[in-house]
Structure formats: C-alpha cells, structure tokens
Amino acid sequence: MTNALYQSSINSLPLLGHGKVRDNYAVGNDKLLIVTTDRLSAFDVIMGEPIPDKGRVLNQMANFWFRKLAHIVPNHETGIAPETVVAADEVEQVRGRAVVVKRLKPILVEAVVRGYLAGSGWKDYQATGKVCGIELPPGLQNAQKLPEPIFTPAAKAEMGEHDENISFAEVEARIGIALARQMREISIRLYKEAAEFAATRGIIIADTKFEFGLDDNGVLTLMDEVLTADSSRFWPADSYQVGTNPPSFDKQFVRDWLEAVRIDGKPWPKTAPAPKLPDDVIEKTAAKYREALTRLTGEELK
C-alpha cells in the first residue's frame, strides 16, 4: 500500500516514545515533535497494518479544530513548521503529519464528553441507568441524544490496557476540585461549539475525548489531538436513527469487523496480536477517514 507510514524513524531527534498512533520526539527541553502515523488502534490493541493517509487526515483535522476553538482555551501549538526541526532526509516522514508543540505536564484524565448515548456509555446505562455515576432519565435508547451533554471522564491507562470510566468525584480527588471543575466546564464548552458547527456540515458528534496538560505557569492547555475521527464518534446526520448504531466516520468499521471475526471458530479476545485486516477493510476505513475530513472541514487532504 502506498502513502502509509507505520512507524517514523527520526534519528536527528531524541525519541521519547511510540504511543498507539503517535511517535513523540524531544525538540530542545520545552517542545515536542509529534508524528501522527498511519497505525490504527482498536479496543486498545494496535493493528498490524497501517491505514493509508490516516495520519495526515488526523493531523489536518486536529489543526483545523485547534484553530477554530483557540478562543475557548489555550492549546499546545507553537506554529513552528515540523520540516524545520528534522534532517533533510527526514522531511518526507513529517510532511503533513507532524506538529511541533509545547511540552506540557499531562493531566492523566481523559476528558470525555457525550452528547448522545453510545458505545461504553450505552452499555453502562443499560446496566445501571447511569454513565460514570451520572444519573440519566429512564427509557433512553441506544444512540439517543441526551438532554444535555455530560462529562464522563476516564482514567488514562497504560499502553495496551483499557481506559477506565471514573466518577467526577474521583477526578476531583486525583487533580483537585478547582482544576477538575475547570476541565469539565471547558470540555463541555468545546464539545457544544464543535457539535454546533458539525451540525451545519451534516455531521453529529456523538461523543469525543479531549486531553489537557498544564504549562509552566499551571495554565490548563488543550493538547494531543482534538475532535478527530480517532478521538470522536462522528455520525452522518442524514442516516441517523435512534435505537440503531449509526454508520460512523471513524474506526467503527474496523471495530465491527473485529467483533464479527472468528479465529479458530472463536471470537477475537481483544488482546494482542490483532487479526490481519483484509485489504477491503483497510481501503474502506481509509476512505471513511478522508470523507470525514472533507465533510467536516470542507478541506481536501493537503
């Protein structure tokens, strides 16, 4: 497959680590180079095959939202071109898929906002009538819009482990009451503004995950990726129906295939190694990512 980068290899900068999708390098003491690869992770397991262009799509989408939402909260962007911090023979690895960002102290809580009942939120609700300890009205259906968006944080897990939904009280205990409340308020504001914009483009943002860090002055700063097809559930508004799982512009396609696949007659146990993705699943997933970018931002892949 062409246009695919499974793992970067930037030897001119110190490697800090490979995440599920991103490779991080140090740029001096106060900045990072983040390279978004074409790796795909589903159920917290990294697939063995890259999805062509996925990293560039995610990078362009995140940059679009960072600019659009900058009036709500500071973000990690520096405006430095990634091509200027690597060696000449490494430029192709970063072109269109990397950013140079401020080095922040990460807050180890995923700030999840849900406007609709879906995924693990729907499962929690079916079992308990609540999501992350938040009581919801009885009788809601799968994919139903919630009366108001809710903040349902998760504890950031180690690589390969599943993030765990936690209550707001637990977030307060972990990071302090004032910071927890600020994070909740900003996350809901970001979600509402993004959802309002996406609606004008015929897309429903069912839920999304934000990540924050603190800068040297202790200022809450938006980081990592924002409102991409990896960190959000995007549904086309024209085929949305309550009570069904709407087809989404993200890796749901891969998740559904993984749920259905049988290995030696048994379901895949959602642990590494992942089953080999068929070419048609890879191609359809790549097309979904590109379509999400165009539909949402009006931009073609640069």
Swiss-Prot record:
Q: Which UniProt keywords apply?
A: ATP-binding, Ligase, Nucleotide-binding, Purine biosynthesis
Entry similarity comment:
Belongs to the SAICAR synthetase family.
A cellular component term from Gene Ontology for this protein is: cytoplasm
The UniProt record lists the EC number as 6.3.2.6
Name of protein: Phosphoribosylaminoimidazole-succinocarboxamide synthase
Key word Ligase present in the record? Answer: yes
Using the record for this protein, list the coiled-coil segments as residue ranges, or answer none: none
What PROSITE patterns has UniProt attached to this entry? SAICAR_SYNTHETASE_1, SAICAR_SYNTHETASE_2
Name its species.
Cupriavidus taiwanensis (strain DSM 17343 / BCRC 17206 / CCUG 44338 / CIP 107171 / LMG 19424 / R1) (Ralstonia taiwanensis (strain LMG 19424))
Q: Which HAMAP family match?
A: SAICAR_synth (MF_00137)
**Which pathway is this protein engaged in?**
Purine metabolism; IMP biosynthesis via de novo pathway; 5-amino-1-(5-phospho-D-ribosyl)imidazole-4-carboxamide from 5-amino-1-(5-phospho-D-ribosyl)imidazole-4-carboxylate: step 1/2
Listed under GO biological process in this entry are: 'de novo' IMP biosynthetic process
So what does this thing catalyse?
5-amino-1-(5-phospho-D-ribosyl)imidazole-4-carboxylate + L-aspartate + ATP = (2S)-2-[5-amino-1-(5-phospho-beta-D-ribosyl)imidazole-4-carboxamido]succinate + ADP + phosphate + 2 H(+)
GO molecular function (one): phosphoribosylaminoimidazolesuccinocarboxamide synthase activity
Cite the InterPro entries for this sequence: SAICAR_synt/ADE2_N, SAICAR_synth, SAICAR_synthetase_CS
Q: Pfam families given for it?
A: SAICAR_synt (PF01259)
